């Protein structure tokens, strides 16, 4: 299984407008910078402003708007702000990158922690663990719904005779393709994003929108900082145990998805050894044929689910 050649023509991105949730840090911010260098006008929709300054000379390409992805009203307002910022009055790319860190603990762990079952005392409602589902899945559903709604607005000077090359990009995780017995809500949310992608991709072309999904392996970002620090406190180097992929590789995969007009309906696994098409289709066992060698390499490297 050979990795994909992610070479693509970045000139096709010049002058386009993108809406990126979770664009203030991590993968979202790194992607925003890469696309801005290619001439894309970026709206960063996040609950916080960018964590570091944008590139000198490219400030005019960036627009920040507060956005809580779990709130429909907040997302609607953010999309409207992005459309007002876009020089063409339209959006070309929507990237659902907002996410929360893995909430530790299997559902069984959480149930046992609630104590002995009783009819006298109600069990506590899960809070922090459910946040994974609220942000990662519900947030992605809202973003993709509104993205497909607002991507239909034509830009000024758009030739209706030319084919549209707009793009909706989901971000799941390799956790959407494997068992995760040490956590429940994070993989559940990512499996949900994968399901949303698979149920959506066959229909988006009728709106002139391509639809793709990223399924990255672990990479060093603010989201995994709590886990990284907890493992370090136990004397475990997370980077060595997991063999991080690079955030640059994830950015390259995202760029390949939006800049390549022939790429549609593909789920890309970003691994330390390269980026692979998971072939998440019926003909290829819904990704299983590709996933087996991918996970075997991770086990050979010392990863234990």
Curated annotation (Swiss-Prot):
Active site: 186, 190
Signal sequence residues: none
List of residues binding NADP(+): 25, 27, 48, 68, 186, 190, 221
GO molecular function, one term: 2,4-dienoyl-CoA reductase (NADPH) activity
E.C. number: 1.1.1.352
UniProt pathway: Mycotoxin biosynthesis; sterigmatocystin biosynthesis
EC main group: oxidoreductase
PROSITE patterns to which the protein is assigned, alphabetical: ADH_SHORT
GO cellular component terms, A-Z: mitochondrion
Induction annotation: The genes forming the sterigmatocystin biosynthesis cluster are co-regulated and induced on oatmeal porridge or the fungal isolates were grown either on oatmeal porridge or in YEC medium (0.2% yeast extract, 5.0% corn steep liquor).
Gene Ontology biological process terms in this record: fatty acid beta-oxidation; sterigmatocystin biosynthetic process
Function according to Swiss-Prot or TrEMBL: 5'-hydroxyaverantin dehydrogenase; part of the gene cluster that mediates the biosynthesis of sterigmatocystin (ST), a polyketide-derived furanocoumarin which is part of the most toxic and carcinogenic compounds among the known mycotoxins. The first step in the biosynthesis of sterigmatocystin is the production of hexanoate by the fatty acid synthase (FAS) units stcJ and stcK. The polyketide backbone is assembled by the non-reducing polyketide synthase stcA by condensation of the starter hexanoyl-CoA and 7 malonyl-CoA extender units followed by cyclization and release of norsolorinic acid.
Protein name stated in the entry: 5'-hydroxyaverantin dehydrogenase stcG
Source organism of this protein record: Emericella nidulans (strain FGSC A4 / ATCC 38163 / CBS 112.46 / NRRL 194 / M139)
Gene: swtcG
């Amino acid at each position: 299984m050979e990795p994909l050649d992610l070479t693509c023509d970045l000139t096709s991105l010049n002058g386009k407008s993108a809406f990126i949730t979770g664009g203030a840090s991590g993968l979202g911010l790194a992607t925003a910078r890469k696309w801005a260098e290619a001439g894309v006008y970026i709206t960063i929709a996040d609950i916080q402003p960018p964590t570091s300054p944008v590139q000198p000379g490219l400030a005019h390409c960036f627009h920040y708007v507060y956005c809580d992805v779990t709130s429909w009203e907040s997302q609607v307002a953010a999309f409207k702000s992005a459309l007002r910022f876009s020089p063409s009055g339209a959006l070309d790319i929507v990237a659902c990158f907002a996410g929360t860190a893995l909430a530790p603990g299997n559902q069984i762990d959480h149930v046992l922690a609630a104590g002995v079952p009783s009819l006298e005392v109600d069990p506590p409602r899960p809070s922090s663990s459910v946040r994974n589902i609220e942000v990662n899945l519900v947030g992605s559903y809202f973003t993709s719904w509104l993205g497909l709604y607002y991507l239909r607005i034509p830009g000024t000077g758009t030739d209706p005779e030319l084919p549209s090359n707009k793009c909706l990009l989901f971000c799941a995780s390799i956790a959407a393709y494997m068992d995760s017995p040490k956590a429940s809500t994070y993989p559940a949310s990512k499996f949900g994003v994968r399901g949303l992608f698979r149920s959506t991709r066959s229909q988006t072309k009728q709106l002139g929108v391509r639809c793709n999904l990223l399924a990255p392996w672990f990479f060093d970002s603010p989201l995994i900082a709590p886990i990284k620090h907890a493992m370090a406190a136990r004397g475990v180097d997370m980077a060595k145990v997991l063999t991080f992929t690079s955030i640059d590789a994830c950015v390259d995969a995202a760029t390949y998805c939006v800049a390549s007009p022939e790429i549609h309906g593909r789920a890309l696994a970003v691994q330390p050894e390269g980026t692979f098409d998971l072939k998440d289709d019926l003909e290829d066992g819904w990704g299983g044929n590709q996933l087996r060698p991918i996970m075997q390499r991770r086990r050979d490297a010392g990863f234990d689910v």
